[in-house]
């Protein structure tokens, strides 16, 4: 254990044999009904890792049936003490911690994450999130209500039922924990669809679900494509809730499918273009580093990236200079290699989309300060890119890039920057850097975002709720608010012969 409290960084595993490639339904491994499989690739080498069974509508039906049976009244899961549910989630967290090295290595191979980041950050958050949710299992309580008349009234927080959980490829272990932790601690059963690009860690966790002792059907994991498996979950008449993290475009489709089917409950965490505002009185060293990490962590593949950076005019030139110097310090290569701190984008499609947006920045008049091109002959690498002289009407200032591209815009006044920062369809997170407390309070109150970080960035924790305003989605994940997204409140009122205070 290091002095910072983080575990020491071991070497990644070598020559991993992929053990789990089938669908996990009812605590058993299944081939797909259609017999189809799909390839999974290493984005650093472009090599195929393995083939994984491809879930389709028929497989989703099987998973939903198993989940529904596990949720029936009188089932082992429904009759289990809440404290025991919590113990199962604690056990799962312990098993993930036991297999932390394997999971971090898989995450690096399959998702292109720098190994140190996967091991120290992603797996750390995953384990903490599950333990946080485990602690909530026997603390979800209703209330007694002093209603008028000779009645006794109280509320129950009941599990919603069968929940479909769909998440993307950029942080598979974090997103898995943020979905299954709250759902399971409240007593729901789940159908998990990991991204087709990165299913391997979720499938390993499936084996740990069984090892931990969860009853059959409580957790089902069905890798597949969005238009087939994802659509089947979203439109299924026997799924009671769907929680989705991904693009706004797909989020709209999921909400529409939910409405047109059984009006299932929906939680959405969608796209973003997050403002990060640096005032002239900020600690410049700290602001440069936080803003830098905010956009370049995980090669910019983050919904909470600091992708719309506003810097006050008086410090603009120095801020740009320091940001460029910082962006030039990366070491590229296979993310499993010691010393490498910049990995690939997830696939060719994402790589090409990012490069197209970089080219748009050049054509629309932004000044390319560094980067701006691909790197290497193999893998989907893009150089960390910094643009200055960016204006609000440019595509790189308006569109979610989801890549290692920092665009730095200039502002003159507080009122101006608040208006510009809010001039977006999105509202997920924001950052503010200033030593002036009044300014910090004013700006954080005015920004239309679900999370505002002051003099920090990427300071996410399992104890705090996360979610978006506007087209960044609705509902919250993690924290107490995120737990209650997975319950229905029932009021029970009974007639009594006499009521006394």
From Swiss-Prot:
Pathway: Alcohol metabolism; ethanol degradation; acetate from ethanol: step 2/2. The active site is at 269 (proton acceptor), 303 (nucleophile). The record marks 170 as: Transition state stabilizer. Its EC number is 1.2.1.3. NAD(+) binds at residues 246-251. It catalyses: an aldehyde + NAD(+) + H2O = a carboxylate + NADH + 2 H(+). Coiled coil: none annotated. CDD domains: ALDH_F1AB_F2_RALDH1. It is found in: Cytoplasm. It comes from the Eukaryota. InterPro entries: Ald_DH/histidinol_DH (IPR016161), Ald_DH_C (IPR016163), Ald_DH_CS_CYS (IPR016160), Ald_DH_N (IPR016162), Aldehyde_DH_dom (IPR015590). Keywords: Cytoplasm, NAD, Oxidoreductase. GO terms for molecular function: aldehyde dehydrogenase (NAD+) activity; identical protein binding; NAD binding; retinal dehydrogenase activity; structural molecule activity. One of its GO terms (biological process) is retinal metabolic process. It is an enzyme of class 1 (oxidoreductase). GO terms for cellular component: cytoplasm; protein-containing complex. Eye specific, with very high expression in the lens. Pfam families: Aldedh (PF00171). Homotetramer. Belongs to the aldehyde dehydrogenase family. Major component of the eye of elephant shrews, which in contrast to other mammals, possesses both a lens- and a non-lens class-1 aldehyde dehydrogenase 1. This eye-specific form is a structural protein of the lens and, in other part of the eye, serves as the major form of ALDH1. Can convert/oxidize retinaldehyde to retinoic acid. This is Aldehyde dehydrogenase, cytosolic 1.
């Amino acid at each position: 254990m290091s002095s910072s409290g983080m575990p020491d960084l071991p070497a990644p595993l070598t020559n991993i044999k992929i053990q789990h490639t089938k669908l996990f339904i009812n605590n058993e491994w299944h081939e797909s009904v259609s017999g189809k499989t799909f390839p999974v690739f290493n984005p650093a080498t472009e090599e195929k890792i393995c083939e994984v069974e491809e879930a389709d509508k028929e497989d989703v039906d099987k998973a939903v049936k198993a989940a529904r049976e596990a949720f029936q009244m009188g089932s082992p899961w429904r009759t289990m003490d809440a404290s025991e549910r919590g113990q199962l989630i604690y056990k799962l967290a312990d098993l993930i911690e036991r297999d932390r090295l394997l999971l971090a290595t898989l995450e690096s191979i399959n998702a292109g994450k720098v190994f140190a980041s996967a091991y120290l950050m992603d797996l750390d958050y995953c384990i903490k999130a599950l333990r946080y949710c485990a602690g909530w299992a026997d603390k979800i309580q209703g209330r007694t209500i002093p209603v008028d008349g000779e009645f006794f009234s109280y509320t129950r927080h009941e599990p919603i039922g069968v929940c479909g959980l769909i998440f993307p490829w950029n942080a598979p272990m974090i997103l898995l924990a943020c979905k299954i932790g709250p759902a399971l601690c409240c007593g729901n059963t789940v159908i998990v669809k990991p991204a087709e690009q990165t299913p391997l860690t979720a499938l390993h966790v499936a084996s740990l679900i069984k090892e931990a002792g969860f009853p059959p059907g409580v957790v089902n994991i069905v890798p597949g494509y969005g238009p087939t498996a994802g659509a089947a979950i979203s439109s299924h008449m026997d799924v009671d809730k769907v929680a989705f993290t991904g693009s706004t475009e797909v989020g709209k489709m999921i909400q529409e499918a939910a409405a047109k089917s059984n009006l299932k409950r929906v939680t959405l965490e969608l796209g973003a273009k997050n403002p990060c505002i640096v005032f002239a009185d900020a600690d410049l060293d700290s602001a440069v580093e936080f803003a830098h990490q905010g956009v370049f962590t995980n090669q910019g593949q983050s919904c909470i990236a600091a992708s719309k950076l506003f810097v006050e005019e008086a410090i603009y030139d120095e801020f740009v200079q320091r940001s460029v110097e910082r962006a030039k310090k990366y070491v590229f290569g296979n993310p499993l290699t010691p010393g490498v701190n910049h990995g690939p984008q997830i696939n060719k499609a994402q790589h090409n989309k990012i490069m197209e947006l970089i080219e748009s920045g050049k054509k629309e008049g932004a000044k390319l300060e560094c980067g701006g091109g691909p790197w290497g002959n193999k893998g989907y690498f893009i150089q960390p890119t910094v643009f200055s002289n960016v204006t609000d009407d440019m595509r790189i200032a308006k569109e979610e890039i989801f890549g290692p591209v920092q665009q730095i815009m200039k502002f003159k006044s507080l009122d101006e920057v608040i208006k510009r920062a809010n001039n977006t369809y999105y509202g997920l997170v924001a950052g503010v850097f200033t030593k002036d407390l009044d300014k910090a309070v004013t700006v954080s109150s005015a920004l239309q975002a679900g999370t505002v970080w002051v003099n920090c960035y990427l300071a996410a924790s399992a104890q705090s709720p996360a979610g978006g305003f506007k087209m960044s989605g609705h509902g919250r994940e993690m924290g107490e608010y995120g737990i209650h997204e997975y319950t229905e409140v029932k009021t029970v009122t009974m007639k009594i012969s006499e009521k006394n205070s």
